[in-house]
Amino acid sequence: MTTIAKQDKIFMKRSGAYHSELDKDIVQKAGNFPLMQFKTKVKVNPKFLLKGDDMDIVDEAITYYKANVFYKNFDMSICEADKLLVYLIFYIQSLLLKFNGRTKVECDKMAYSLAIENFALPGDGKFCLGGIVEPLKASEKEVVRQYMTAIRNETGLRLTQAVFKNDPTKCDKWWMCFNKRKFLNKTI
């Protein structure tokens, strides 16, 4: 059992933020980090593929980003899916910082390269959720890395569609006005 650091307990205080309603889509847990189904055209393990037009965790993260980015506290004990939602909000925040002043084509390329770069896995020392997520077993690491790469890639694709909805040459100002906000006073 891992101990939760004092600063991470502050994370978990009750807040009025939007929480995930998609606990039913959790397919597997790695440590205590949820791996959920999502819609994608990116290559992913079939058990993580969500069919249909229902809202998935990526839709939730993009939809709730603007509202949740203002919160300094987020209670992740309400549902397990919140851990992935918070991670995706951090990821969206890092993408928006890089999108400023670029075109859709440039942002698509940047989002893809950011998705496949080396990143901290849940339970690693540099992972953005710190002590809230348990370390992974050696057998889980490769599955989680593939899953996280696919969901980061899909999040980047959908975010560029949202940010460049009106004009492929210019970022939407209603998205970019949030790019300097720090969700939970952290970045990834």
UniProtKB/Swiss-Prot annotation:
Pfam families in alphabetical order: P21-Arc
Gene3D superfamilies recorded: Actin-related protein 2/3 complex subunit 3 (1.10.1760.10)
One term of GO molecular function: actin binding
Protein name: Actin-related protein 2/3 complex subunit 3
Biological-process GO terms, alphabetical: Arp2/3 complex-mediated actin nucleation; regulation of actin filament polymerization
Keywords: Actin-binding, Cytoplasm, Cytoskeleton
Disulfide bridge positions per record: none
Function: Functions as a component of the Arp2/3 complex which is involved in regulation of actin polymerization and together with an activating nucleation-promoting factor (NPF) mediates the formation of branched actin networks.
InterPro entries in the record: ARPC3, ARPC3_sf
Family: Belongs to the ARPC3 family.
Coiled-coil region list: none
Species for this entry: Entamoeba histolytica (strain ATCC 30459 / HM-1:IMSS / ABRM)
Annotated compartments: Cytoplasm, Cytoskeleton
